Amino acid sequence: MQEILNKAYKGFMGVVDSFANSTAGEPSKPKKIEVVKPASIPDYAYSCDNYIDSVLENKLTRQTLRAIATKYYGQQIEEVTQNGSKLTEKNYPRLFANFQDCCKTLNVTNHPKVFVTSRLTGINALSVEIEKEPIVLLSYMSVIGLNDLEQKFLLGHELGHIQLGHMLAHTVQGLLNDLNKRVELLGPIVTDLIDVPLNRWYRTSEFTADRAGYQCCKDMNTIRCLFKRLEHDAPVNAFNQYKELSDAYPRMSTRLEQLSKYVLIIKLK
């Protein structure tokens, strides 16, 4: 185990430098970083949800992050996709229709694969990227226990992560949190890396994804009810924990507050 962690340490030390360099500058006058962005940034994107662009723009950093993500989560994701049920119109017609509708609403033309799996407990969904391929994972309870609008919010949320390119950084953020807990030596380094820039961006990325979910759902009452259910359905298995139980993951009340502000702005336009 120690040998593996040592390799991980060497692998992301360069990433530390990239994060540090991308956030350098005086607080009052932050340094402007030129970033090559996608041809079209969705209108729902949170105004601060551009931090990770400057990091992933570095080819070496991007390759390192992908290598780390694949090494430590690739096998888990492969097992999930092999043992789960791939979404088709035949096996989950209602979910399939809702997914197609969300893709149309968000203008997602390259549809990611969706798998329904028992590895996620309760009402849960997760978007990941392995070998440059985005995948959406859904729990069985999300299929049978949610109505159409609730499913659309959940699917739209994950599609928002994919559309903005969040998955790779989310995966590595989970790994770094895990390393921080396991290796005392890495504590100060990982804490500086995670708590200051990455966790701040991580929370912002959730606000953006919630906006995407709203675009697909268009019903705040549905979202409020769903958030109440999610608060009482915390994930318990190890596969879930790297994302949902992270200190960076914003509280439901905070997410709802931010989303309500966004909806109010839309209605006032």
Question: Which residues does each predicted region cover?
Answer:
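Short pre-active-site segment immediately N-terminal to the catalytic Zn-binding motif
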Residues: 90, 136-153, 200
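A structural motif
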Residues: 172-193
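Short helix/loop segments within enzyme catalytic domains
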Residues: 90-96, 102, 106-109, 186-243
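Active-site His/Glu-centered metal-binding helix of metallohydrolases
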Residues: 155-164, 208, 212
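Hydrophobic or amphipathic, alpha-helical segments that drive membrane association/targeting
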Residues: 1-128, 195-196, 234-237, 243, ...
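Catalytic Zn2+-binding segment of zinc metalloproteases
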Residues: 158-178
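Amphipathic alpha-helical oligomerization/assembly segments
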Residues: 248, 252-255
